[in-house]
Amino acid sequence: CETEEERARTSELIRPILRGRDIKRYGYEWANLYLIATFPACRYDIDNYPAVKDYLVSFAEQNLRESGNNWVADLYLEDYCKQKLAQTGKFIEIKGKRIYIGNTAEKARKKTSNKWFETQDSISYWEDFSKPKILWKRVGSILRFGYNKNGALGLDSTCFATGNNIEYLCGVLNSPMGHYLLKDSPKTGTGDLLISVQAVEPIKVPQISQAENDTFKYYLDTNDEEEINRKVFELYDLSNDEKTYINENFR
């Protein structure tokens, strides 16, 4: 970016991204990865973000040269870019020759009403990414639900949930009680859990007040897992024997 004003404007588009492997209990270990998030609903004018535009366009020449198509990069780069961004879904041909990147024939992106720099499909819930949320790995042998409030996005190896009392829900899902509630989730052939949104939705979670959620938020901020687990057991009104069984088998 050439100016601080442009840098501040551009920062809206560049969002931290989390992979499934980054998700930890109650948090995450960010790998310093970013994603350019240009949601169609935001109606961005890419010319107001010249650094982002130059970065996106640079991949065309880079991909051509790395795949041995130097002649296209040297002589027909503009034609190649126009075809690539035409949103026709057609194969790209230069001087009657189909262009390949590796073993894959290059095609224009599919027909869509969105602009070339935007995601191909509209995302109606794009604003939810900016809200405090829970992220978790979709497939895994260990249950971990991370809490995020800095607007990070998640790869498709993750699921996320947002809404009211999200800190409380994060506590329930990470607790032994939460692991017990998810014990019958579908599994892969190798025994890994398939924790889709559909697997989480049916679990029974007691309703709480805003004040109680604030208590869970405090415990979450102070990493007080023992107090979270105790409070969750209290809300489910379990007997001592039931608590012992769950603690011994679902930590």
Language-model-derived ranges and their functions:
Residues 51, 207-251:
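Non-catalytic DNA-recognition/assembly elements of restriction-modification systems
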Residues 1-214:
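Polybasic, glycine- and aromatic-enriched phosphate-binding surface used to engage nucleic acids
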